[in-house]
Amino acid sequence: MLSLSTQSDHEKIIDFLNNKKKSFNKYNFTGGKGYIYHKKFLKEMDSTLLNEFQAHAKGIETLYMLNKKKAIPDSLIINIGTGTFLLLKKQGFKHLGGSALGGGFFMGFIKLLYNTHDFQEALSLAEKGNRYNIDLKVSDIYEAMDHRVNLIFREFTAASFGKIKYDLDLSTVKKEDIINSLICMIGENLGTMANLVAENHNIKNLIFCGGFLKENKISERILSTICKINKKKAIFLKNSEFCGAIGALLS
């Protein structure tokens, strides 16, 4: 079982798979780049190309059983990888769509800003940051005594990067705050979208998975908070970045 990012070095992957041919007589491939490897090895060995969404569904079912010791209930599965897709678990699995926001957007943005490509380093910096040094909250707009806005709504984000004004001295803006804000912006938008979709399908359980959430406590806190506000249950499974690979292995 091997799980890889979309932007992985394909030549290195092919070398790795070539070295493993003596140990295995069958390869199962899934994901957007799976076709490249399936085509490469199809004439040499038993190679199968699997539907990405079906593989993820099977992987999540397996991880849920291992983590919770029971079958997966009716749920909305939100897989945040390079991009994001939604799967509805309700009498089977159904792909509902997704978003371009995710790890690909995040890594591309921090590469443009800071010329870094280390995800874990970015997370460490973000943990030291404070998004509200640059993000505009509703409470920054409405006066404290304004009865039109309740206490919960005051804590919502009115505008990501909303405190970065035209005359701001950019040298005063901290890298840690920007990366923190960026992660929160992704989480808030995906969390809001997921909760609206879940409500439309009368779903209470939201299962969040994918490589972007690996050791990403900031996103986990944001997604949990949004679910709590919307009276939904946020579920995070260990090793969920491997759900596609697990599903492919078991197919």
Locate the predicted segments by residue:
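Glycine-rich phosphate-binding loops at beta-strand->alpha-helix junctions
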Residues: 27-37, 196-197, 201-225, 241
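Glycine-rich phosphate-binding/hydrolytic loop that grips phosphoryl groups
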Residues: 57-65, 106-111, 118-119, 123-124, ...
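Active-site nucleophile and cofactor-binding loops and adjacent substrate-binding regions
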Residues: 5, 47-57, 78-80, 96-101, ...
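Glycine-rich phosphate-binding loop plus the immediately following alpha-helix
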Residues: 91-146
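Adenine-nucleotide phosphate-binding core of ATP-dependent small-molecule kinases
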Residues: 150-205, 212
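Short beta-strand-loop/turn "lid" adjacent to the catalytic site in phosphate-handling enzymes
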Residues: 2-6, 17-52, 85-95
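Short beta-strand segments
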Residues: 28-30, 76-83, 87, 100, ...
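Conserved phosphate-binding catalytic cores of ATP/NTP-utilizing and phosphoryl-transfer enzymes
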Residues: 48-77, 83-91, 246-251
